[in-house]
Amino acid sequence: MAVMEVACPGTPGSAVGQQKELAKAKEKTQSLGKKQSCIFKLEAVEKSPVFCGKWEILNDVITKGTAKDGSEGGPPAISIIAQAECENSQEFSPTFSERIFIAGSQQYSQSESLDQIPNNVAHATEGKMARVCRRGKRHGKARKKRRKKRSKSLAQAGVALAKPLPRTPEQESCTIPVQEDESPLGNLYARNVSQFTKPLGGPGLGHLCFKKQDEGLRPVLPRPELHKLISPLQCLNHVWKLHHPQATGPRPHPTHPFPYSGMPHPFPFYPLEPWKPYMLDSAVLDKLAGVSGQRPLPGPPHLSQLAHGDSQKPLPGPHLESSCPSRGALEKVPVEEYLVHALQGSVSSGQAHSLASLAKTWSSGSAKLQRLGPETEDNEGVLLTEKLKPVDYEYREEVHWMTHQPRVGRGSFGEVHRMKDKQTGFQCAVKKVRLEVFRVEELVACAGLSSPRIVPLYGAVREGPWVNIFMELLEGGSLGQLIKQMGCLPEDRALYYLGQALEGLEYLHTRRILHGDVKADNVLLSSDGSRAALCDFGHALCLQPDGLGKSLLTGDYIPGTETHMAPEVVMGKPCDAKVDIWSSCCMMLHMLNGCHPWTQYFRGPLCLKIASEPPPIREIPPSCAPLTAQAIQEGLRKEPVHRASAMELRRKVGKALQEVGGLKSPWKGEYKEPRPPPQDQATCHQTLPTPPRENPPAKANTDGAPEPQPPLPPEPPEPSKAPALNLSKEESGTWEPLPLSSLDPATAKGPSFPDRRATLPELELQQLEIELFLNSLSQPFSLEEQEQILSCLSIDSLSLSDDSEKNPSKASQSSRDTLSSGVHSWNSQAEARTCSCSTALARGRPTDIPSYFNGVKVQIQSLNGEHLHIREFHRVKVGDIATGISSQIPATAFSLVTKDGQPVCYDMEVPDSGIDLQCTLAPDGSFAWTWRVKHGQLENRP
């Protein structure tokens, strides 16, 4: 209990007590000039102010305190209860009640902006009003006369008298709603109180007690150990006065008076630093700043200027640069910006929303990163589990945690390793992503998700140019790796994993999160294969609450894996959660057949085929149960409105699993050859359990009734029919006259396939290919759709991997596993070195072309200033890239250097994080080049 003592005349000392926090007020004190034989009665203070001028506020302190008779066994004294005492010895921090008594205004504040700020009175009932009780009047006539005389004398002296208040203490009489002391704001100012609790120097700034002097009391400085604060308003005013004692001149009268006009403005100390507000602090400060609506506060710079650091005029005192976000004086700063400001530059344990807020500053376009540069060794982040412990606000690789070899997986933009915390010994998976290719959606979308079908996130830390994303380690690897090991999966196990993936998608879609890249490589399995969980949110998207989707296809970014793309994605139409349903059914075809959909029938850019061809339901194995085939067809409807939702499809998959007898196949069985494509068109018709469902998107019927089917596209020819083309062996080795839209992969891996690469007629074939695409575009689509699909064609096309070329028995097993994307793509293909070096901008080169979704990112500035954005295979060499773009460079001889002009070796492999180069001239008479490309041929200086 905090107590302030006032000694009485004729007493040797004063009773033992504690002192309440006192605040500054106005100017001088006025003594009370009458002796009393016993204690001062509180009733005498009600009508007659003891203190005037600067210390007039002490009248309110005394009148709102609790007076008791101190004559029991000791010298008489007045004990004023300043603050309630907490039973558990918890330190009290100054806060506000809902109705604040305004000094000098004779009223309580009715501001609604402070209605959420609790009053930490110990063990009070939350939301209830304190009971008002008054004692009966027992005053004699003599005492009334004395009060009347004293009031008249003070009125003649020009001193305003305070309105009489209840005789009972504030805790008993004030009708102020209070809260339990367990309020989350109970220790709001405890973190910053240390910088305000130093004793103030100077006679006008300290706290006062009073001693007898002649007929009245004079103020003296108290003992320093009794110093405490009263409220945030008063303590902040103390600090400002301490730093700016000269700023005591008259202040202009504001247009909109501050409600607490009876006391100095609470936040005039703008230049004080360092003070980094925490999240809860900023919430309270926002309330205080907006206490008078959105109007500016009077006096010195108000709170918004303090937080925003945008004062219109300099204040006295040393200038200290504000570290808070800079905003306009009248603009409110979101709490999230204060939170991010507090998190930057350190690694701490926190919540998911803190990590999501901090991750937004890691994007490549962040102003802070552009200012600091990508190679800074800053270490900042948020860890979401206690098993990963930062040390001294840092969490660095090889210092606080270490990785284990070999790596778990690799994608287009990063690698996945097993890691171990050196302090706790906890092991999990870590994704190492370059800052240039990091997408903030990876963390924003999955932070805070708690579903067994979603790989949990353990935190993320930025260390220099790398972002390390920690997540649960599932020992079973990826579903794509399992398909690689088993060839193809049994129907029951494929249904089992599809059902779990749909359960995870249902969880995401109810939270308006679009995964964007559902495929077998992004489904991780437990060590026994009983649990499947979705990972890799690098292409995730938060959908709008109104349900209106947006196009995922942009000029420099295409989400997902090409073979799993929905038609609305490749055509640039608005997308919603139905995109994931299409991709999940494509993953189902991958599990049943052992290869990606579309790849058995078409070669080249698949975007056109996905947009123009019917859904790939003909790839459903004929051995599938009817309910299984029906479930796949429900998810492969071309029109999203007719496509099943995640919940609907999950129920259908569950019924199909029951139809086949449940999960009975072993977790890892014998290798089974992938299913070959149908041999003829008749077989294809027989494999469709419900043929009327295969309709083009423009003719989809809303009631689901069967409609006449259009002619099916040409089917791939049988391998035995290839010699029927009447081509000589020499011609067949020169180029392939087969229609590119129906090329069977088996025909592409014959003995003449390697010889085809070095022939000139391939250029004519490339031209015919483009003309064929243009002709097919002119029929079913509008002009806008044609332009969108043509933009996809300018990217690049698929190619057979070297593994399928070297091992024809596993050609269909190759299944384009390099078609990976995102931050965390578990590449299930063996790391065979590819010999392809062509790009989307070098179609004239007769070699295989890597997928846009797999290759590393290469950016080259041409001689005329144009930028070429290229996707290449992993481990491709710089010299091969230069040779591939030679037809696009307007120079006879050129070489490649870095952006700052440093030379690079022609045999240097492009890192997974990508590379940024520029062209430079390499004439014969120059000695600046060590290698060059001249007339399309690589030359090395001897």
Curated annotation (Swiss-Prot):
Classification via Pfam families: Pkinase
Keywords, sorted A to Z: ATP-binding, Cytoplasm, Kinase, Nucleotide-binding, Phosphoprotein, Serine/threonine-protein kinase, Transferase, Ubl conjugation
Gene3D superfamilies cross-referenced by the UniProt entry: Phosphorylase Kinase, domain 1 (3.30.200.20), Transferase(Phosphotransferase) domain 1 (1.10.510.10)
Chain residue ranges for the region called Disordered: 136-156, 291-326, 660-756, 801-823
GO CC annotations on file: cytosol; fibrillar center; nucleoplasm
EC top class named in words: transferase
Post-translational modification: Phosphorylation at Thr-561 is required to activate its kinase activity and 'Lys-63'-linked polyubiquitination. Phosphorylated by CHUK/IKKA leading to MAP3K14 destabilization. Autophosphorylated.
Composition skew (Basic residues), residue ranges: 136-152
EC number: 2.7.11.25
Location(s), subcellular: Cytoplasm
Gene ablation phenotype (knockout): Mice display the alymphoplasia phenotype (aly), which is characterized by systemic absence of lymph nodes and Peyer patches and disorganized splenic and thymic structures with immunodeficiency.
Region (Interaction with ZFP91): 403-655
Segments of skewed composition (Pro residues): 707-720
Job description of the protein: Lymphotoxin beta-activated kinase which seems to be exclusively involved in the activation of NF-kappa-B and its transcriptional activity. Phosphorylates CHUK/IKKA. Promotes proteolytic processing of NFKB2/P100, which leads to activation of NF-kappa-B via the non-canonical pathway. Has an essential role in the non-canonical NF-kappa-B signalining that regulates genes encoding molecules involved in B-cell survival, lymphoid organogenesis, and immune response. Could act in a receptor-selective manner.
Similarity comment text for this entry: Belongs to the protein kinase superfamily. STE Ser/Thr protein kinase family. MAP kinase kinase kinase subfamily.
PANTHER family xref list: MAP KINASE KINASE KINASE SSK2-RELATED-RELATED, MITOGEN-ACTIVATED PROTEIN KINASE KINASE KINASE 14
Subunit relationships: Interacts with TRAF2, TRAF3, TRAF5, TRAF6, IKKA and NF-kappa-B2/P100. Interacts with PELI3. Interacts with NIBP; the interaction is direct. Interacts with ARRB1 and ARRB2. Interacts with GRB10. Interacts with ZFP91. Interacts with NLRP12; this interaction promotes proteasomal degradation of MAP3K14. Directly interacts with DDX3X. Interacts (via C-terminus and kinase domain) with PPPC3A (via N-terminus) and PPP3CB.
The protein's name in its UniProt record: Mitogen-activated protein kinase kinase kinase 14
